[in-house]
Regions:
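Alpha/beta-hydrolase active-site loop signature
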Residues: 33, 58-62, 124
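Conserved catalytic-core motifs of eukaryotic protein kinase domains, centered on the activation segment
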Residues: 38-40, 64-69, 128-131
């Protein structure tokens, strides 16, 4: 789905299902230079198991507009604002690669949103991919 947020359109994959009132949310976070497509099979599985899925393309990634964010902190803050705009109160967060760092930063900066964390192929530090920043200039 396209969600207008902070003057850009954000692409949010939902696993092929509309959100249902009262269902738990699962937020899938892609890595640097990636998109919601990272989570195609997983998002559909959880959606068909009854979860509300949010797999956003970060600004400047995939099908989302805008310019790439330049820090993990900015990504977590942006994500918290997006979730607030969508009316999400808590969620399980699943991150891959740089998405792990965003999930961890969410737990640190915006812990009220974080019910569970699943971190796949993360690292202690992953810089924002410079070609993304350069490409948006």
């Amino acid at each position: 789905m396209k969600f207008e947020f902070e003057q850009i359109f954000v692409h949010i994959a939902t696993g092929g299902r509309a959100h249902k009132d009262g269902a738990d949310f699962v937020v899938f976070l892609h890595g640097s230079g990636q998109s919601h497509l990272t989570w195609g099979l997983q998002s559909r599985y959880f959606a068909y198991e009854g979860y509300n899925i949010i797999a956003p393309d970060f600004p400047g990634h995939g099908l989302s507009g805008g310019v790439p964010l330049t820090s993990i902190e900015d990504m977590a803050d942006w994500l918290a604002r997006l979730l607030a705009a969508m009316g999400v109160q808590t969620a399980a967060f699943i991150g891959h690669s740089q998405g792990c760092l965003v999930a961890l930063e969410m737990a640190s900066r915006h812990s009220a949103y974080v019910d569970k964390l699943c971190l796949i192929a993360g690292a202690a530090a992953i810089p924002v991919n410079e070609w993304l920043v350069d490409a948006s200039a």
